[in-house]
């Protein structure tokens, strides 16, 4: 007697028994294996409509008796029934979510047991945290692949079905006249086939991941740190120096305890070595030695200052021909206006106008507020009668009274000019006076007749002469320092670098998640969908945006029914009509898996940090449970900002 064999529908929806393509209302999907079957070809179709909701196909229900086979195949028969029983057990487990059931079914069908999968999960967890930057790239590479070349997409294009492809692969596929997805055979709209749009969110995410990998792959730079206490007494060079002399020298020990942004004279309390402070007339061999005593910290630049804080000191070293030195007052030229690109560090030709910015702005701010500015003169200033014969000399503090701009001696470009007037309690090195300066009238400057952008101080200066005490002093509180005096110890710097490195990896994941942001709710995507115009939205947000809107509009007039008109539903981010896409928006499962993996890595990193903190603090589990835990929590509505503690 001939055996009646029942067969399901194939991948194209064609019944494998009658070779016809049944309509959807004549097809049934198995609740276990999700395989479509032709109802007319079933030997025992469901009796009622309710029974179709949880219908099981003949293969899964075991209604068909197995074909007579040899005894050697009994193992396969028992294995098949065991597989069906295991799938039914998974479906009956109400504690599992739909996603977890799907994963467990996939494990069983792939021949991998639950125990093997658990061991693999343990191995993954054990290896987590070793290289977080590479984990970020693997999260993309494992889940986000081109459906044609199976590589990380280059210029990714997201199709309406939710699958991604390289732009080049997509255009090649479309050029062959194929209008279906290469993975799921879904129809691709004609408009997208002619004008595909690159998914900018995926581009930014892939770029960030590649940058993090390249940064992790490069050899970390070695920092040679020497604390101030361990530095030699004079500037020194090491075997790493490329040039002889002091061209590559490092600074010696700093002897004064002032911050780099200290204004005014250096008193005795800031000189623990000699207990006398910085005296007018002190000389040093070079600028590096001058730096060690705090007179002028930069060993190359002529201006020490900050544009929003003020200038602390200047050096007269003959850098500009415009400078005029008259001892108790001098005209100083600002910095800039020269092309120093490449190896033109000593270029003396003006190329453009100087402006009141950067160091020049710092001098102007000191002029406005009346701050004292320390002045050192170098033997390189050959045009001045007040320059030392050798080395560098400290000449006291000056105050900037005016500043302006004028065309320089080269005759083409403007330079910034400053009038410095001496205001120190100690006599100048070139005088035989026993007392310091007294307030003197501002000298006549002929070049002011041709000056532009002239600025004169209107308010009372912070550093001024007190007639009652007969000395120069701070009439207003000096500005608070913004820089620390003591440099971090090597161990503290090491811990800080570790914290910065850990924060970088956390920030990289946070930045990646920020790229996967819904354009409507501005939160991390949940069930992401990508429109044909390459904009990403949460599926719920997009559906809620167009809730209550129909695809067609019925029209009538005067009792007559007119032809229905299609409603134009524009994308929330651009004028593109996405009404066809909204009929059945497909979730981009690849992007969803990437987001889920990044969130999991974020949570695992937080757990590892908690464990490390517990080990460092030496607390017991009972004590640790009583203490508040520090966690880096990733919400779906915002990304994590890394914090260094």
Swiss-Prot record:
GO MF, one example: methyl-CpG binding
Localization annotation: Nucleus
One cellular component (GO) term of this entry: chromocenter
Reactions listed under catalytic activity: S-ubiquitinyl-[E2 ubiquitin-conjugating enzyme]-L-cysteine + [acceptor protein]-L-lysine = [E2 ubiquitin-conjugating enzyme]-L-cysteine + N(6)-ubiquitinyl-[acceptor protein]-L-lysine
Chief site of localization: nucleus
SUPFAM superfamilies: FYVE/PHD zinc finger (SSF57903), PUA domain-like (SSF88697), RING/U-box (SSF57850)
Keyword presence, Repeat: yes
Domain YDG: 273-422
CDD domains, alphabetized: RING-HC_ORTHRUS_rpt1, RING-HC_ORTHRUS_rpt2
Coiled coil: 583-613
Domain of life: Eukaryota
Gene Ontology biological process terms, A to Z: cell division; chromatin organization; negative regulation of gene expression via chromosomal CpG island methylation; pericentric heterochromatin formation; protein ubiquitination
Keyword field contains Zinc-finger: yes
Function: E3 ubiquitin-protein ligase. Participates in CpG methylation-dependent transcriptional regulation and epigenetic transcriptional silencing. Mediates ubiquitination with the E2 ubiquitin-conjugating enzyme UBC11. Promotes methylation-mediated gene silencing leading, for example, to early flowering. Associates with methylated DNA, and can bind to CpG, CpNpG, and CpNpN DNA motifs, with a strong preference for methylated forms, and with highest affinity for CpG substrate. Probably acts at the DNA methylation?histone interface to maintain centromeric heterochromatin.
Quaternary structure note: Interacts with histones CENH3, HTB2, HTR3 and H4.
Other known facts: ORTH2 is missing in cv. Bor-4 that exhibit a centromere repeat hypomethylation phenotype.
Family matches, as PANTHER family: E3 UBIQUITIN-PROTEIN LIGASE ORTHRUS 1-RELATED, E3 UBIQUITIN-PROTEIN LIGASE UHRF-RELATED
Domain remarks in the Swiss-Prot or TrEMBL record: The RING fingers are required for ubiquitin ligase activity. The YDG domain mediates the interaction with histone H3.
Record's protein name: E3 ubiquitin-protein ligase ORTHRUS 2
Native source organism of the sequence: Arabidopsis thaliana (Mouse-ear cress)
């Amino acid at each position: 007697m001939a055996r009646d064999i029942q067969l399901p529908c194939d991948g194209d929806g064609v019944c494998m028994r009658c070779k016809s393509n049944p309509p959807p209302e004549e097809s049934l999907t198995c609740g276990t294996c999700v395989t479509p079957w032709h109802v007319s070809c079933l030997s025992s179709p469901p009796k009622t409509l309710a029974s179709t909701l949880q219908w099981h196909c003949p293969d899964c229900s075991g209604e068909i008796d197995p074909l007579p086979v040899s005894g050697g195949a009994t193992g396969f028969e028992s294995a098949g029934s065991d597989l069906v029983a295991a799938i039914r057990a998974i479906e009956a487990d109400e504690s599992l979510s739909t996603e977890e059931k799907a994963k467990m079914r996939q494990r069983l069908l792939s021949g991998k047991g639950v125990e093997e999968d658990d061991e693999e999960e343990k191995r993954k967890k054990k290896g987590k945290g070793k290289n977080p930057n590479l984990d970020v790239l693997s999260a993309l590479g494992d889940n986000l692949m081109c459906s044609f070349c199976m590589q990380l997409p280059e210029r990714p294009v997201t199709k309406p079905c939710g699958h991604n492809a390289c732009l080049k692969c997509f255009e090649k596929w479309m050029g062959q006249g194929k209008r279906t997805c290469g993975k799921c055979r879904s129809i691709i709209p004609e408009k997208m086939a002619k004008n595909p749009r690159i998914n900018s969110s995926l581009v930014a995410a892939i770029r960030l991941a590649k940058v993090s990998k390249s940064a992790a792959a490069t050899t970390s730079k070695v920092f040679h740190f020497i604390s101030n206490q361990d530095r030699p007494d004079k500037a020194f060079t090491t075997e790493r120096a490329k040039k002889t002399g002091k061209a590559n020298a490092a600074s010696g020990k700093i002897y004064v305890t002032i911050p780099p942004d200290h204004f005014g004279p250096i008193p005795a309390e800031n000189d623990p070595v000699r207990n006398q402070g910085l005296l007018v007339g002190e000389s040093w061999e070079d600028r590096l030695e001058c730096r060690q005593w705090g007179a002028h910290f930069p060993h190359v630049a002529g201006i020490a200052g900050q544009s929003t804080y003020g200038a602390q000191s200047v050096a007269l070293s003959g850098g500009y021909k415009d400078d005029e030195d008259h001892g108790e007052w001098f005209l100083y030229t600002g910095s800039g206006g020269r092309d120093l690109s490449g190896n033109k560090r000593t270029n003396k030709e003006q190329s453009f106008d100087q402006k009141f910015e950067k160091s020049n702005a710092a001098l102007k701010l000191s002029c406005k507020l009346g701050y004292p500015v320390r002045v050192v003169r170098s033997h390189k200033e050959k045009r001045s009668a007040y320059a030392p014969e050798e080395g560098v000399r400290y000449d006291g503090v000056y105050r900037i009274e005016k500043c302006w701009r004028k065309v320089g001696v080269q005759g083409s470009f403007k330079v910034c000019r400053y009038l410095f007037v001496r205001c120190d309690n100690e006599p100048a090195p070139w005088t035989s006076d026993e007392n310091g300066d007294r307030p003197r009238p501002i000298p006549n400057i002929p070049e002011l007749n041709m000056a532009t952008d002239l600025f004169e101080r209107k308010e009372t200066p912070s550093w001024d002469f007190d007639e009652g005490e007969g000395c120069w002093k701070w009439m207003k509180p000096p500005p608070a320092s913004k820089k620390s005096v003591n440099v971090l110890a090597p161990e503290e710097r090491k811990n800080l670098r570790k914290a910065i490195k850990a924060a970088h990896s956390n920030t990289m994941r946070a930045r990646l998640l920020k790229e996967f942001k819904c354009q409507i709710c501005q939160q991390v995507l949940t069930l992401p969908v990508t429109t044909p115009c390459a904009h990403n939205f949460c599926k719920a947000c997009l559906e809620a945006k167009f809730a209550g809107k129909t695809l067609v509009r019925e029209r009538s007039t005067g009792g007559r029914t007119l032809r229905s008109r299609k409603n134009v539903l524009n994308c929330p981010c651009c004028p593109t009509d996405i009404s066809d896409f909204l009929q059945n928006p497909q979730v981009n499962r690849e992007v969803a898996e990437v987001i889920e993996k990044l969130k999991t890595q974020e949570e695992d990193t937080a757990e590892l940090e908690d464990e490390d903190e517990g080990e460092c603090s030496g607390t017991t589990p009972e004590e640790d449970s009583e203490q508040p835990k520090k966690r880096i929590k990733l919400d779906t509505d915002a990304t994590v900002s890394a914090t260094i503690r």
